[in-house]
UniProtKB/Swiss-Prot annotation:
It comes from Prochlorococcus marinus (strain MIT 9215). It is found in: Cellular thylakoid membrane. NDH-1 is composed of at least 11 different subunits. The gene is ndhA. This is NAD(P)H-quinone oxidoreductase subunit 1. HAMAP family: NDH1_NuoH. GO terms for cellular component: plasma membrane-derived thylakoid membrane.
Length: 372
């Protein structure tokens, strides 16, 4: 399936119409994908924060934000502006360099991970052959930033929160990677594009969630733990650690943690939709739509329609998972730190390893169903 809107090609052709050379058009294009990722991530965070406030209000029989814009849609922007104008404080006995580097080291890998998220056949920033491996590698950097922030704050609550965050992230990253390996084993590829295309054979029935139900559950639990969402928010448990590794942070440094947490949640939901829910896949084949409209499959109208539907389907699937994550936050109690680590090491790790071995066996026995 090599159809779909190619943004880079279309943009370069548009600039060539003004007499610019291919080299200049390519140079102009280079910074745009990263800018597009930043805008998409920030807009996604604003929507998610608004949903969080409204869903939490409904769970507690409240109204939630209603005065800042219609239905309170401007409340997340007001929150961001408030953090933007707050004083940036560095504690007197803190390590200033590490204290500042910590939030950056937490946020940057999460944003870079968006580079491998496809919204269509050609709608992604970087179609690297090792896309999933790159995401796992980038996500392993985050615990360093969390531990660095806790240590540099020179605060016992911050240090304990940083240690908890690092232990939690390491504990759940291994079963998460093993559940992803089962998908890679069936797809024979680390490319996110190939993983989605492999699920396009029979519509919804070819989604990986039917062949990897255990992997799906393990991945989603681990993703929630990596995002430090309830019931796994031990690193910043208010009743125990004030705000964990964020205790001494204020202003934009605190906003970077806040932003990184929500961007990571949206990223995790997008990856679940790509790995297990068919990504941009539409129930009706594009070939039938093109035939119905009596147009070739590479016609501009079909390409725009395919790109639009791909974005809508990917985002809808992702936000369904975000809704579930928000609902879990306001309906489940927090686990203890020993229960958290026991769940990761003694339960999810053996299950994910067994799931990988069973997938390998099923691939040998039923190659037509498990990607022989």
């Amino acid at each position: 399936m090599d159809y779909g809107l190619d943004l880079e090609y279309s943009f370069n052709e548009f600039l060539k119409g003004f007499g610019l050379s291919s080299e200049i058009a390519h140079i102009i294009w280079l910074p745009l994908p990263m800018l597009l990722v930043l805008v998409a991530a920030v807009v996604g965070v604003l929507v998610t924060v608004w949903l969080e406030r409204k869903i939490s209000a409904a769970a507690q029989q409240r109204i939630g934000p209603e005065y800042a814009g219609a239905l309170g849609v401007l409340q997340p922007i007001a929150d961001g502006l408030k953090l933007l104008v707050k004083e940036d404080i560095i504690p007197a006995k803190a390590d200033g360099i590490l204290f500042t580097a910590g939030p950056i080291l937490v946020l940057v890998p999460v944003i870079l991970s968006w580079l491998i998220v496809p919204f269509g056949q050609n709608l992604l920033i970087s179609n690297v052959g090792i896309g999933i491996f790159l995401w796992i590698a980038l996500s392993s950097i985050q615990p360093i930033g969390l531990l660095m922030s806790g240590y540099a704050s020179n605060n016992k609550y911050s240090l304990l929160g940083g240690l908890r965050a690092a232990a939690q992230s390491i504990s759940y990253e291994i079963p998460l990677a093993l559940s992803v390996l089962a998908i890679v084993l069936m797809t024979n590829s680390l490319s996110t594009i190939d993983i989605v295309n492999q699920q396009s054979g029979a519509g919804i029935l070819s989604w990986n969630i039917w062949r990897q139900p255990v992997g799906f559950i393990v991945f989603w639990i681990c993703a929630l733990a990596e995002c430090e969402r309830l019931p796994f928010d031990l690193p910043e448990a208010e009743e125990e650690l004030v705000a964990g590794y964020q205790t001494e942070y204020a202003g934009m440094k605190f906003a970077l943690f806040y932003l990184g947490s929500y961007i990571n949640l949206i990223l995790s939901a997008l990856l679940v939709s790509i790995l297990y829910l068919g990504g941009w896949g539409f129930p009706i084949p594009v070939e039938l739509i093109a035939k119905f409209l009596n147009l070739p499959i590479n016609a501009p109208l079909i390409q725009v329609f395919t790109a639009s539907i791909g974005i809508v389907m990917t985002v809808l699937k992702a936000y369904l998972l975000v809704f579930i994550a928000i609902l879990l936050r306001w309906t489940t109690p927090r686990v203890r730190i020993d229960q958290l680590l026991d769940l990761g090491w003694k339960f999810l790790l053996p299950i994910s390893l067994a799931n990988l071995l069973i997938t390998a066996g099923l691939k040998l026995a039923f190659p037509q169903f498990f990607g022989g």
